[in-house]
């Protein structure tokens, strides 16, 4: 009985990363020894993707509305430079992801037919489609998975509810918690879903699919390394006009390393607070900027959304021009700012970006499933970049402000 309880505890409370790794290995093993069994196991993957597809629209709608409705005003802190750095870093990371994706295009193993796709003719058609999706009926948007329409209605409802009573705001917040709990339950089935997806994909397409995922993972991690070691130091140097690398490496070592294993920006907040204190930063500033950064500073998420979306477009042979790629960078940056509240991280926001290219929700959720397969490393690297950048930009803004007023600057490393 104790063994049974221990097994149940491992399933419900054990490391999701470890369970996904087990599912990944078992899926490969099943595909190697039994093609028919692997294809049959694909039902588990189909159910998992369908569950994600069902819950994602409701999650985005409730989460965004609750976040805006419960936003607090009147916080008196010198936050503008830090917020600007957060937004600049996230958008610039999306641009880096676009460049890397064009330089090293990735192919995904998707079960789809290109003939079913109606790609946009260019930026004008994309913008026209975008505007039409914005004014979609909210119920139709939820039912059809029109994430742009869902966002528009969620923002509108959230702004309206900011003037509601505290009781109403609490109800909306409770709804957000309830939906997030359901998503967490769905995510707990990720190992089974990954097992089915990997086994059926390998059985139907062969082991070449693994190389496709390996290439995609290399593109993702390569873009994140470029941002961490090149782009972010350039931004820091632009602000403080001195060698940025002591601070960059300190943040990566003391914040990024723990975030890599916790895979949670929120869980890494105490680590970042302690690092800010160690660096001698203004407590009134970092007490606000670090929790805020865990919510809106999402360079890693912007990279994930951009790379996977462009990989899907490349796989479906959809031509992407430069203006559309720039629009994707902007959309990815905006989506990334909301990724922290999503239990699946940035992956569940990929369908929104995919909709820019006329990619159906069915195929977009297959891309999300690919993200879960590579998520063991992708999510860890993404969180490490996101969380370490919170401290990096907070320290940068504090040092720049202190130097502009002639005060003694904080210790950089």
From Swiss-Prot:
One GO BP annotation of this record:
threonine transport
TM spans, by residue?
A: 14-34, 44-64, 82-102, 141-161, 178-198, 217-237, 290-310, 330-350, 356-376
Q: How does it sit in the membrane?
A: Multi-pass membrane protein
Enzymatic reactions: L-serine(in) + Na(+)(in) = L-serine(out) + Na(+)(out); L-threonine(in) + Na(+)(in) = L-threonine(out) + Na(+)(out)
Q: Which UniProt keywords apply?
A: Amino-acid transport, Cell inner membrane, Cell membrane, Membrane, Symport, Transmembrane, Transmembrane helix, Transport
Q: Where in the cell is it found?
A: Cell inner membrane
Record-level GO cellular component terms: plasma membrane
- Enumerate the GO terms in the molecular function aspect: neutral L-amino acid:sodium symporter activity
Cite the InterPro entries for this sequence: Na-dicarboxylate_symporter, Na:dicarbo_symporter_sf, Ser_Thr_transp_SstT
The yes or no answer to whether the keyword Nucleotide-binding is present is no
Gene3D superfamilies referenced in this protein's UniProt entry, alphabetically:
Sodium:dicarboxylate symporter
Domain of life of the organism in this record?
Bacteria
Principal location: membrane
NCBIfam families assigned to the protein according to its UniProt record, in alphabetical order: PRK13628.1
Q: What does this protein do?
A: Involved in the import of serine and threonine into the cell, with the concomitant import of sodium (symport system).
Family the entry assigns: Belongs to the dicarboxylate/amino acid:cation symporter (DAACS) (TC 2.A.23) family.
Q: Which HAMAP family match?
A: Ser_Thr_transp_SstT (MF_01582)
Protein name (database record) = Serine/threonine transporter SstT
- The organism named in the record is Edwardsiella ictaluri (strain 93-146)
């Amino acid at each position: 009985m104790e063994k049974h309880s221990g097994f149940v505890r491992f399933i419900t409370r054990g490391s999701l990363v470890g369970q996904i790794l087990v599912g990944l290995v078992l899926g490969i093993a099943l595909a190697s020894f039994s093609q028919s069994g692997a294809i049959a196991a694909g039902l588990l993957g189909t159910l998992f993707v369908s569950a994600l597809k069902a819950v994602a629209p409701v999650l985005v709608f409730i989460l965004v509305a609750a976040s805006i409705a419960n936003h607090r005003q009147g916080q008196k802190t010198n936050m503008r430079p830090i917020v600007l750095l957060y937004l600049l870093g996230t958008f610039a990371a999306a641009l880096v992801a676009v460049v890397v994706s064009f330089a090293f295009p990735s192919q995904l193993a998707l079960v789809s037919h290109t003939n079913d796709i109606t790609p946009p003719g260019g930026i004008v058609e994309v913008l026209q489609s975008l505007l039409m999706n914005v004014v979609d009926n909210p119920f139709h948007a939820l039912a059809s998975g029109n994430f742009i329409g869902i966002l528009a209605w969620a923002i509108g409802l959230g702004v309206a509810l900011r003037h509601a009573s505290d009781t109403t705001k609490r109800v909306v917040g409770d709804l957000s918690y309830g939906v997030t709990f359901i998503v967490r339950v769905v995510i707990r089935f990720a190992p089974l879903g990954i097992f089915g997806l990997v086994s059926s994909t390998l059985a139907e397409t062969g082991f070449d699919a693994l190389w496709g995922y390996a290439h995609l993972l290399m593109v993702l991690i390569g873009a994140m390394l470029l941002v961490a070691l090149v782009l972010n130091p350039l931004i820091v140097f632009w602000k403080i006009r001195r060698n940025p690398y002591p601070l960059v490496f300190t943040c990566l070592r003391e914040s990024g390393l723990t975030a890599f294993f916790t895979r949670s920006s929120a869980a890494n907040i105490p680590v970042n607070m302690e690092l800010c204190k160690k660096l001698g930063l203004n407590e009134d500033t970092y007490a606000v900027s670090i929790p805020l950064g865990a919510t809106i500073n999402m360079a890693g998420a912007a990279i994930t959304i951009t790379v996977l979306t462009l990989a899907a477009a490349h796989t479906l042979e959809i031509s992407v021009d430069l203006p559309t790629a720039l629009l994707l960078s902007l959309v990815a940056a905006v989506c990334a700012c909301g990724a922290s509240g999503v239990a699946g991280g940035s992956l569940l926001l990929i369908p929104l970006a995919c909709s820019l290219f006329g990619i159906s929700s069915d195929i977009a959720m297959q891309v999300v499933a690919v993200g879960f397969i590579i998520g063991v490393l992708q999510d860890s690297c993404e969180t490490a970049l996101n969380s370490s950048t919170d401290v990096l930009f907070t320290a940068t803004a504090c040092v720049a402000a202190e130097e502009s007023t002639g005060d003694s600057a904080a210790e950089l490393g």
